[in-house]
From Swiss-Prot:
This is Ephrin type-B receptor 1. PANTHER family: EPH RECEPTOR A5, EPHRIN TYPE-B RECEPTOR 1. Belongs to the protein kinase superfamily. Tyr protein kinase family. Ephrin receptor subfamily. It comes from Mus musculus. Receptor tyrosine kinase which binds promiscuously transmembrane ephrin-B family ligands residing on adjacent cells, leading to contact-dependent bidirectional signaling into neighboring cells. The signaling pathway downstream of the receptor is referred to as forward signaling while the signaling pathway downstream of the ephrin ligand is referred to as reverse signaling. Cognate/functional ephrin ligands for this receptor include EFNB1, EFNB2 and EFNB3. Pfam families: EphA2_TM, Ephrin_lbd, fn3, PK_Tyr_Ser-Thr, SAM_1. GO terms for cellular component: axon; cytoplasm; cytosol; dendrite; early endosome membrane; endoplasmic reticulum; filopodium tip; glutamatergic synapse. The active site is at 744 (proton acceptor).
Amino acid sequence: MALDCLLLFLLASAVAAMEETLMDTRTATAELGWTANPASGWEEVSGYDENLNTIRTYQVCNVFEPNQNNWLLTTFINRRGAHRIYTEMRFTVRDCSSLPNVPGSCKETFNLYYYETDSVIATKKSAFWSEAPYLKVDTIAADESFSQVDFGGRLMKVNTEVRSFGPLTRNGFYLAFQDYGACMSLLSVRVFFKKCPSIVQNFAVFPETMTGAESTSLVIARGTCIPNAEEVDVPIKLYCNGDGEWMVPIGRCTCKPGYEPENSVACKACPAGTFKASQEAEGCSHCPSNSRSPSEASPICTCRTGYYRADFDPPEVACTSVPSGPRNVISIVNETSIILEWHPPRETGGRDDVTYNIICKKCRADRRSCSRCDDNVEFVPRQLGLTECRVSISSLWAHTPYTFDIQAINGVSSKSPFPPQHVSVNITTNQAAPSTVPIMHQVSATMRSITLSWPQPEQPNGIILDYEIRYYEKEHNEFNSSMARSQTNTARIDGLRPGMVYVVQVRARTVAGYGKFSGKMCFQTLTDDDYKSELREQLPLIAGSAAAGVVFVVSLVAISIVCSRKRAYSKEAAYSDKLQHYSTGRGSPGMKIYIDPFTYEDPNEAVREFAKEIDVSFVKIEEVIGAGEFGEVYKGRLKLPGKREIYVAIKTLKAGYSEKQRRDFLSEASIMGQFDHPNIIRLEGVVTKSRPVMIITEFMENGALDSFLRQNDGQFTVIQLVGMLRGIAAGMKYLSEMNYVHRDLAARNILVNSNLVCKVSDFGLSRYLQDDTSDPTYTSSLGGKIPVRWTAPEAIAYRKFTSASDVWSYGIVMWEVMSFGERPYWDMSNQDVINAIEQDYRLPPPMDCPAALHQLMLDCWQKDRNSRPRFAEIVNTLDKMIRNPASLKTVATITAVPSQPLLDRSIPDFTAFTTVDDWLSAIKMVQYRDSFLTAGFTSLQLVTQMTSEDLLRIGVTLAGHQKKILSSIHSMRVQMNQSPSVMA
């Protein structure tokens, strides 16, 4: 209250408190004691002012004597910090013309001077009388003078003049008045300075502020917000001008939340039951419905029990509650699909943002236990956040009981500690058509036909009667498609055009009808050139067959000769170093044998024999896509005469190469040119007759397999991953049958095209591993560099590379694929990897890896290389898995193979993490950081309470990412329960 009174006083006295007096002769009750010189000049007398008050004055009237120079000096005046001083003089002057017999030296003016000093330097005995030390302020002239008549009638014509001077810097000053022939009285002298008064403006207090040294000066005064007020935007300030007046303020203060303005000078606390949420609000408001403020100065009203306010609700909005459950559910079952419809909740909680979630549970026949539905179930328009009271659910299992919970939620459901209200409905699906075929593989192709195979649907839902194949040229559309049927999961499509790309789909049929067509996949028939090339490759087989007939006849003759002799002798057969083909004895066509290009005396001959020379004019280079050992790798186009233009990858040989580097570079083309398989990267040709030298291969849109998997973590099904592995194994089977050992089989050396077909590549590196000194993947061993993490132990120890060592590497590739590109053996050093393998430790199964696949990995990692499966056996095993997807349902665990010690990648110590950011970084899910924080999961304690529905709600939709995060949350929860202090 006292402060309020003070503020009111400051406002009321603002105008009156603008001048501070330093000296005023009107208040003197004794002699002023000023110094006059000469003594006959100025004289101090007592008199009366116009109001007949007694005053002390000085007068002088020596007008009858010429050459007057009368000085009057005040006492020392302390300036009290003022920079500019004002002097108010009240005086009377006799009109010279009213004086008889006055000489011409009579004056009606006088001069005002000042002298600035730090101390008293002039007294009556030691005064200085010269204009030199003084600074003249002005010559003072009377506006009115009086005559004898006025004097006789006692009419006092008093003049008042104000003069200012400055700036002053010393402690004080003297005033001096000079008379040089006037008849006058100095009635009073008031010396003062101006200042801007204390004031309250815009809820801020500004202190008294002296004016500046000049009349035009502006002095800044910083304001202080009154109690319970805060500055808004810029700091608040006022300018004090030379007249002691405040200028327009800059900035302002306003009452802070919980306080309202009172009389524009105070901020009063909001009473109980009211609130003020922001500085900008004018006054306190009553609490909205279902909320209260039990104490004063509340910035917000808290919700009553059972009511909540959403994060995005403003404070002035009423608190609301959660909705009741949906009503009157209707279900319509159609084979393995269902339509659910319902009525909105009877109580919406006072909100208009009610949405619905569908929780799907698949149950046993007796419904005693249920589990969440898998990710294959489809919801239209969606599973979570439905705005309409209707949903279509498909891809359910046939003849299976289901329970569906329909939850009603609104903007405050997440604030409630209780689960959302819901209504449940139990249904059982009927017989249904089979699910889709997951993938197709090309077995072979001719100019006029393509042979395909595929696994049966994951959910056959009965006995498969047959398959229907739909196909059409890619350049056309499905309205121009043709149909074919097959009783098995293999079909040969005839009557096709050479060199054309065909789009193919397949679907299965049961007694319930056809299932949906599979996804579209592209396959290509052979061109005329491809056919001729294949024919050339089979000529040795034809010649060999003819030779075999001759040999047979000769053999009969030889047998008769041998039988007629008592002894026979044998001699060693000589074989040509350049034997390229032989009949395998397994039927047509015969298998080619790989020829090492370095067995040629002239390696260029190998290039000419195995690689087709391409004119550089047929090649268009477009953009850099990488860098190889010998130069840059480009994406480009190849347009050969009579063929359509295709995308290609172009490896170039950098300038300044040596002849050895050129041979080494082209050796990869000599190797690649010998291979022809859908899962081996295809060589289009080489450019050697111009610069730069180029190796041209087919273009693989998705790049290296390891980085492709990391970019698509969790986005592929197990069947799709097994299909990729099957393609890699088929390519390696082909290489092993050609007696070619890859030596560097790894996911980084597998390329993926747009149809997810995986192809083995990088054939130049296997011979030159010892030349790579920069890549930490490769470690020195026996004078060379080998990729330790992918290499069989016998190859590390003795550099014994065989197809069996490639099988070991293939097992590592399997682990890379099933872990979506994780680094084998994680952050273990290469030496630690070698030691662990020598002690018979093997990699554990990746997360959610089927047990059958991990067992195949362990088979590939047998210490005895003769115990490892051959690539042909691996292909057969994977084909069985694809044909029987149920075999992939069992997930492997570390304890599943007690006879085989497995490396255990230790679970991170989650108790060491302090923030959600640290935890997400540790599990490599940092891309969801903003989603967690925005949704309010800002602490690890909150994270441990998350469910799969929470992950869906914040945007984690990939199944693999959900499983990875939920697994980590479970481990964190276990660790925190073991360390209760962490939960504090």
